[in-house]
């Protein structure tokens, strides 16, 4: 379970959800445990003690002295930035001493490798990206379930991977397929993780304070791929396509792309438009329409020039999730499931079934022919751009909050194209106002979200949407993005009551 180490001494840094999962896993396997957190009494300390886990706890600043006493592995919680000076010094000291530094994902990869010696060989699918991870992960899990597989969905989406694995072992119900949502934080410490197929949905500016630069952030995303992992890539995103192999050599990893245009390479996915209807399609070689995609791709790699046709899968409008960005998410999920040879028919039925996740371009009410859309999970610029372009209708946008140092310039074009007006809230409203001034779209500042919602309702016309997609974090005004969504919903409910409508 720990490489070539038997019951090692493990130092767990950070007692969040992943840190607690690492501690549980290590205790389960007889490791000696030292747990450190910069907080003297982190919330999960009580849970640790209640479960009777035998561990030394050290509160306060991290120092290299935490490695003393024979520490062999450092278990690093994903919320801890490697750029933080005290942590950087500790990690450097660990490297000098030959102490392994793993995150939860590496513990999970090592555990699967150990279980593999007993014959357990599940398929592993992994999803990352700045936006759309949770939707695509949940949808991929559903697709696999509807194909008759026993599925575990875990990771950034919760539950923690190690907790889910432990419960599966205890219940003697190990899944056929693991579907993992992975953040850049979790991938930063990946070393031997090698899923069967993995998708990068998009890469836009986010968490730059944690990673230090956009390039470092993108490189962390790329750690989702092992040497033989099928790569599912968004061909509309240049940063993502940097992970496509330069040459389709015989030993190159298989690559499948998806996008919002017609695919031109055999086995890729996209959208095709005909008589005003958008279709989800797969590019197929007319010479081998019934062969498996892997076989068709071997032909292409051998200098075969395919005669490409667009095989219609289903109308995009048959999806219950709104927006073109969700059509892209659906294509990514379908591509992942097909990469492990699941049959297409049940996958297509499941695509029609999936209703989406809360707070992600979720239509919560329609009042006087105006849609009220909760995208409170849109905590970065890329998410809001995707929501605006995906809805593709006139919108009164509500944006603002803690901008996390982002560049808001990518909002200019979609705001100019789609927005009737923009209501601004939160700490970085002035920064967004300055950026959007050139659009000529009316901009209004509001002290509260409730005031912004009521003002947006007054401006919206039939056929419009009032969209909460802040492009910012929520903590300057709210407990979290879910609390922000609750306030939005309450304001919409009040409008419905005022108008005598049912939200």
Swiss-Prot record:
It comes from the Bacteria. Keywords: ATP-binding, Cell cycle, Cell division, Cell shape, Cell wall biogenesis/degradation, Cytoplasm, Ligase, Nucleotide-binding, Peptidoglycan synthesis. Its EC number is 6.3.2.9. One of its GO terms (molecular function) is ATP binding. Pathway: Cell wall biogenesis; peptidoglycan biosynthesis. InterPro entries: Mur-like_cat_sf, Mur_ligase_C, Mur_ligase_C_dom_sf, Mur_ligase_cen, MurD. Its main location: cytoplasm. It catalyses: UDP-N-acetyl-alpha-D-muramoyl-L-alanine + D-glutamate + ATP = UDP-N-acetyl-alpha-D-muramoyl-L-alanyl-D-glutamate + ADP + phosphate + H(+). It is found in: Cytoplasm. It holds the Pfam family Mur_ligase_M. GO terms for cellular component: cytoplasm. GO terms for biological process: cell division; cell wall organization; peptidoglycan biosynthetic process; regulation of cell shape. ATP binds at residues 129-135. NCBIfam families: murD. PANTHER family: UDP-N-ACETYLMURAMOYLALANINE--D-GLUTAMATE LIGASE. Belongs to the MurCDEF family. Cell wall formation. Catalyzes the addition of glutamate to the nucleotide precursor UDP-N-acetylmuramoyl-L-alanine (UMA). This is UDP-N-acetylmuramoylalanine--D-glutamate ligase. It comes from Burkholderia cenocepacia (strain HI2424). The gene is murD.
């Amino acid at each position: 379970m720990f490489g070539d180490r038997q019951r090692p001494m493990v130092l767990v840094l950070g007692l969040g959800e992943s840190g607690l999962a690492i501690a549980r896993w290590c205790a389960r396997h007889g490791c000696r445990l030292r747990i450190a957190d910069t907080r003297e009494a982190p919330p999960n300390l009580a849970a640790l003690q209640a479960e009777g886990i035998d561990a030394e706890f050290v509160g306060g600043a991290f120092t290299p002295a935490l490695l003393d006493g024979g520490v062999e592995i450092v278990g690093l919680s994903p919320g801890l930035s490697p750029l933080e000076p005290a942590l950087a010094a500790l990690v450097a000291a660990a490297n000098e001493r030959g102490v392994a530094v793993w995150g939860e994902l590496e513990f999970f990869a090592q555990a699967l490798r150990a279980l593999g010696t007993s014959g357990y060989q599940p398929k592993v699918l992994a999803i990352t990206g700045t936006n759309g991870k949770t939707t695509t992960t949940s949808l991929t899990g559903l697709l696999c379930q509807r194909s008759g597989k026993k599925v575990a969905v875990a990771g950034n989406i919760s539950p923690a991977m190690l907790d889910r694995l432990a419960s599966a072992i205890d219940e003697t119900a190990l899944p056929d397929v693991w579907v993992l949502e992975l953040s850049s934080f979790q991938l930063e410490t990946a070393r031997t993780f090698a899923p069967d197929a993995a998708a990068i949905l998009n890469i836009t500016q986010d968490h730059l304070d944690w990673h230090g630069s956009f390039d470092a952030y993108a490189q962390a995303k790329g750690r989702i791929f092992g040497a033989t992992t099928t790569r599912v890539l968004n061909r509309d995103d240049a940063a993502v396509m940097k992970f496509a192999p330069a040459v389709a050599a015989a030993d190159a990893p298989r690559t499948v792309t998806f996008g919002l245009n017609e695919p031109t390479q055999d086995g890729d996915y996209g959208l095709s438009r005909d008589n005003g209807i958008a279709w989800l399609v797969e590019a197929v070689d007319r010479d081998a329409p019934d062969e498996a995609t892997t076989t068709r791709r071997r032909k292409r790699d051998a200098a075969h020039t395919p005669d490409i046709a667009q095989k219609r899968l289903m109308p995009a409008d048959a999806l219950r999730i709104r927006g073109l960005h969700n059509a892209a998410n659906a294509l990514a999920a379908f591509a992942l499931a097909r990469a492990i040879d699941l049959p297409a028919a049940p996958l297509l039925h499941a695509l029609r079934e999936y209703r989406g996740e809360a707070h992600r371009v979720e239509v919560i009410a329609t009042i006087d022919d105006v849609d009220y859309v909760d995208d409170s999970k849109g905590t970065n610029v890329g998410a809001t751009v995707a929501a605006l372009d995906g809805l593709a209708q006139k919108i009164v946008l509500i944006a603002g909050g803690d901008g996390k140092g982002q560049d808001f310039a990518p909002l200019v074009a979609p705001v100019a194209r789609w927005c009737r007006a923009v209501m601004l809230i939160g700490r970085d409203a002035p920064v967004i106002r300055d950026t959007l001034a050139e659009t000529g779209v009316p901009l209004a500042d509001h002290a509260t979200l409730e005031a912004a919602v009521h003002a947006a309702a007054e401006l919206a016309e039939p056929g419009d949407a009032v969209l909460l997609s802040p492009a910012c974090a929520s903590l300057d005004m709210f407990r979290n993005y879910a609390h922000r969504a609750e306030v939005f919903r309450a304001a919409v409910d009040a409008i419905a009551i005022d108008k005598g409508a049912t939200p």
